[in-house]
From Swiss-Prot:
It is a single-pass type II membrane protein. InterPro entries: Aspartic_peptidase_A1 (IPR001461), Aspartic_peptidase_AS (IPR001969), PEPTIDASE_A1 (IPR033121), Peptidase_aspartic_dom_sf (IPR021109). Residues 27-31 are annotated as: Important for proper cellular trafficking. The chain crosses the membrane at residues 111-131. Belongs to the peptidase A1 family. It comes from Toxoplasma gondii. Keywords: Aspartyl protease, Disulfide bond, Hydrolase, Membrane, Protease, Signal-anchor, Transmembrane, Transmembrane helix, Vacuole, Zymogen. This is Aspartic protease 1. Residues 275-616 form the Peptidase A1 domain. It comes from the Eukaryota. Disruption phenotype: No defect in tachyzoite replication. Food ingestion and turnover of autophagosomes are normal. Normal tachyzoites conversion into bradyzoites. No defect in secretory organelles and inner membrane complex (IMC) biogenesis. No defect in virulence in a BALB/c mouse infection model. It is found in: Membrane; Vacuole.
Length: 620
């Protein structure tokens, strides 16, 4: 074999695999052109080596050939050339693999992060939803004998005996008719109730259960709470209206017309507050916050079936977690000023503090879009109607009626005390009156319409002069302001310097906050007694900025003028008179509605047993 042939066989390592040779034409050309003469210092076996060439014996020679295990030798220079061809390809291949691996790792990391984030979100949602369902545990603090008034725990003799309380002379003849204090049997029922409210339980004064109340944005804004106006800058709009009213700047009149797109300002942002308390539904009890509303008679709560978002924002009722739930399924629908509420009926235990009714038929609300943002972002989860049975939806009854029928409470009597005290915004007394909250006698007036808590009065007065001749008044805890016939409210507003603002609903008025402070209080005469409507309560701040007028706390409605109701303008829209009061059944005639602005200045007693409403002066 010639040296050239042996060289080809030598350098063609892994000749059975010609992949690399096929990939590199430079490598093939090197093999084809290789010869002994052109590549000096090529090594060979000893027998074929030229004896005259002794350079291979010199280890220091640059062309020295090192023997391999198979008897072949490696040529350093050629190996360097071949390495220079192989290495770049290896580098490129490794870089590509690294990039692919990096992409795979990055994608895997992203997927893991997304899955982990989704799991965390689901866990949070699950926790929030389940946080809404608070079990009721027995608490010794709720035992009525633990009250400072009724004696120490374990010493029932320390409380005033029932017989002694029954013999206590009444402060008023009508008080004798309505108040039969709690009996020993009632006290034992309350003390043995295994579902008594923990920590937020009631305070018992003279045998009367007193529940705390909290304030929130009003639910019923007399048909205006869902309607909005579009004003680029509402504050500037109101300031300009006040200036124009006072004649300070006529050029600002241009700001009151030709308004374009801007922020939607809901009218209810300027309403005062409404009051709510807590009830427990089911066994174990699930806490729900409800507005105590004398203008309606149903009890409805937000159902757990109303959607994930409302389950997060509200405390909902899940009948699947109640051991005392009984299905009914009858469709439910009620109309409020802002829109309808829909759902279905269910039966379960309902507890207001320690007063628990069994198998009470209530409504689970699942369609609450009609209430708009007033409910969506509100602090309440339902409505506890305290109105007359005739106002209730067919098949339902007021909570107080069920409580009396089940002997949970002896008297169908409840009382509102809306002055702040003891760190709360008000109190709701059940079953009687709290002698610590008022002075003098309770002045009663008979109810004249058994659909609403409506009484006859002598009308509104100012300095002894009659300024509103309408005498019928509805006492409604579900209304924040004082609402009356549009013509009478306009006359009173003009007399007091209040003014209307373009684009605002008809019947809504504003007034200078500073100038109105010098006005005198109004009076409402009921059964020969005058009760105040304070000017400071009629001034509702619309903005903290200087120069912004206050909302006047009286609103006018055509629907309250009597006769045939007609639609009323509301900024850009019109709302029908049917959206006046929740569940309105038939016309109510020429009437005023006295809301929280009036009730906060008096101790208000609702006595269904004797069909009367009582008023007393606040103690403090």
């Amino acid at each position: 074999m010639s040296p050239s042939s042996r060289f080809r066989n030598l350098v063609s390592v892994d000749s059975s695999s010609q992949d690399f040779g096929k990939r590199s034409s430079l490598y093939a050309s090197l093999l084809d052109s290789a010869s002994v003469s052109s590549l000096p210092g090529i090594c060979s076996t000893a027998e074929d080596r030229d004896v005259e060439d002794e350079s291979w014996k010199d280890p220091s020679s640059s062309s020295h050939c090192a023997k391999t295990e198979g008897g072949a030798c490696a040529f350093p220079r050629l190996n360097q050339v071949l390495s220079s061809l192989r290495d770049p390809m290896g580098v490129f291949s490794r870089a590509k693999r690294r990039r692919s691996l990096g992409k795979a790792v990055g994608l895997s990391t992203s997927v893991i992060c997304v899955v982990a984030l989704f799991g965390i979100v689901c866990l949070c949602l699950y926790g929030l939803v389940n946080f809404s369902f608070t079990s009721v545990e027995t608490s010794p603090l709720d035992d009525p004998r633990n009250s400072p008034v009724m004696g120490e725990l374990g010493n029932p003799q320390a409380s005033t005996p029932s017989s002694a309380r029954a013999d206590t002379p009444a402060r008023h003849d009508r008080q004798n008719q309505m108040f039969s204090p709690w009996s020993v049997q009632n006290e034992q029922f309350l003390g043995e109730d295994s579902d008594a409210l923990p920590h937020a339980g009631p305070l018992f004064r003279s045998g009367v259960m007193v529940m705390p109340l909290r304030k929130m944005k009003s639910l019923r804004r007399i048909g205006w709470d869902k309607n909005t106006i579009t004003v680029p800058d509402l504050q500037a709009h109101l300031v300009a209206a006040l200036r124009m009213q006072e004649g300070l700047s006529k050029k600002d009149d241009g700001n009151l017309s030709g308004l374009s797109d801007g922020d939607d300002i809901s009218i209810h942002d300027y309403m005062n507050s409404q009051y709510y308390t807590e009830i427990y539904v089911g066994s174990p009890g699930q806490k729900v916050r409800v507005v105590v509303d004398t203008g309606s008679s149903d009890l409805w709560v937000c159902s757990a079936s109303c959607g994930i978002l409302l389950n997060i924002l509200h405390k909902t009722y899940n009948h699947g977690k109640s051991d005392t739930y009984h299905a009914d399924g009858t469709p439910y629908h009620v109309q409020y000023a802002s829109g309808p509420v829909g759902g279905f009926l269910s039966a379960d235990d309902v507890a207001l503090a320690s007063l628990k009714t069994k198998n009470f038929l209530l409504a689970e609300a699942v369609d609450l879009k009609g209430l708009g943002t007033a409910f969506f972002f509100g602090k309440f989860d339902g409505i506890l109607g305290m109105g007359f049975p005739s106002l209730a939806t067919k098949g339902l009854k007021p909570f107080m009626q069920a409580a009396v029928e089940q002997n949970v409470v002896k008297n169908w009597v409840f009382v509102f005390y809306l002055a702040s005290a003891n760190g709360v915004d008000g109190e709701l007394a059940i079953g009687g009156v709290d002698q610590e909250r008022f002075i003098g006698d309770i002045n009663f007036s008979p109810v004249v319409d058994f659909r609403y808590w409506m009484i006859n009065t002598k009308g509104l007065k100012s300095d002894g002069d009659l300024i509103a001749p309408t005498t019928k008044m509805i006492i409604d805890s579900g209304t924040s302001l004082i609402v009356g016939p549009l013509d009478e409210v306009k006359r009173i507003a003009t007399m007091m310097g209040a003014f209307s603002v373009p684009l605002m609903p008809e019947g809504m008025f504003f007034i200078s906050c500073e100038k109105a402070k010098v006005l005198r209080d109004l009076q409402l005469e009921i059964e020969g007694q005058d009760y105040p409507i304070k000017i400071k309560d009629l001034l509702i701040s619309a903005s903290a900025a200087a120069g912004t007028p206050c909302l006047f706390g009286m609103m006018g409605l055509k629907a309250l003028e009597g006769g045939r109701p007609t639609p009323q303008k509301n900024g850009f829209g019109i709302f029908p008179p049917s959206q006046l009061v929740a569940s309105a059944k038939g016309p109510i005639g020429r009437t005023w509605i006295l809301g929280d602005l009036f009730m906060r200045n008096v101790y208000t007693v609702f006595d269904y047993d004797n069909k009367q409403i009582g008023f007393a002066r606040l103690k403090n």
